[in-house]
Amino acid sequence: MAIHNLACVRDERQLFSGLNEEFAPGDGVQIEGSNGAGKTLLLRILAGLTPPDAGEIRWRQRPLRQCRSDYYRELVYIGHRAAIKPVLTPRENLTFYQGITGLRNDYAIYRALEQVGLLGYEDVRAAGLSAGQQQRIALARLWLTSASLWILDEPLTAIDHQGAQALVRLFEQHCATGGMVIMTTHQPLPASRYRMRKVALRMAEATSCFG
């Protein structure tokens, strides 16, 4: 995946411009920046949900506009909103998700719910759960997907330290098998050998480093 000269303007203010990055299989990338720097908007642009004001995204060397169907099959995007069905239970939400992906594995669903701390709530309607618990239902999808590209906005916010450790281990496993993780977080990652490359959005430009 590559982005070329990406720019974003909101309310007549340029959030970032001239953003050039390449993301290769095995990459874990953390987007950094102050509040209002455009981190969430950048993730939405990368997920194909918001058009950039300039620049291009390429997937497997093809412009995104030419391969959207292929791209979306390889993508999991989890934003601030949980994007779940509130009338369904956590178990039913994940069963529904597996149906979309063409898979069905009840054991995997219960294992995913265990990883995000929702065992015991699997048959409670999502509408009766807290916002954080609803977000954890969305995060549980990561244990069920075969998609190669994960774009995640503040995935650590809704989970405790143990859950964060499990999630970081999952990131490490995903990247070790050729997957990619692009995420934002205000929280430090749990101690791990796993290292993410950092892309910092500052003053309408971006810089890269390893952290």
UniProtKB/Swiss-Prot annotation:
Q: Does the keyword Signal apply?
A: no
Task: Kindly list the positions annotated as binding ATP.
Answer: 33-40
**Catalysed reaction(s)?**
heme b(in) + ATP + H2O = heme b(out) + ADP + phosphate + H(+)
SMART domains membership: AAA
State the InterPro entries in the record: AAA+_ATPase, ABC_transporter-like_ATP-bd, ABC_transporter-like_CS, ABC_transptr_haem_export_CcmA, P-loop_NTPase
The EC code for this enzyme is 7.6.2.5
Broadest EC class? Answer: translocase
Mention any Pfam family matching this sequence.
ABC_tran
Record's keyword terms, sorted: ATP-binding, Cell inner membrane, Cell membrane, Cytochrome c-type biogenesis, Membrane, Nucleotide-binding, Translocase, Transport
Q: Name one GO biological process term.
A: cytochrome complex assembly
| PROSITE patterns per UniProt | ABC_TRANSPORTER_1, ABC_TRANSPORTER_2, CCMA
Q: Name one GO molecular function term.
A: ATP binding
* Annotated localization: Cell inner membrane
Q: Does the keyword Cell membrane apply?
A: yes
Membrane topology type: Peripheral membrane protein
Might you report a single GO cellular component term?
A: plasma membrane
Q: Give every ABC transporter domain span.
A: 1-211
Q: What does this protein do?
A: Part of the ABC transporter complex CcmAB involved in the biogenesis of c-type cytochromes; once thought to export heme, this seems not to be the case, but its exact role is uncertain. Responsible for energy coupling to the transport system.
* Xref: NCBIfam families: ccmA (TIGR01189), PRK13538.1 (NF010061)
User: Subunit details for this protein?
Assistant: The complex is composed of two ATP-binding proteins (CcmA) and two transmembrane proteins (CcmB).
Q: Which family does it belong to?
A: Belongs to the ABC transporter superfamily. CcmA exporter (TC 3.A.1.107) family.
The name under which this protein is listed is Cytochrome c biogenesis ATP-binding export protein CcmA
- Organism (species): Sodalis glossinidius (strain morsitans)
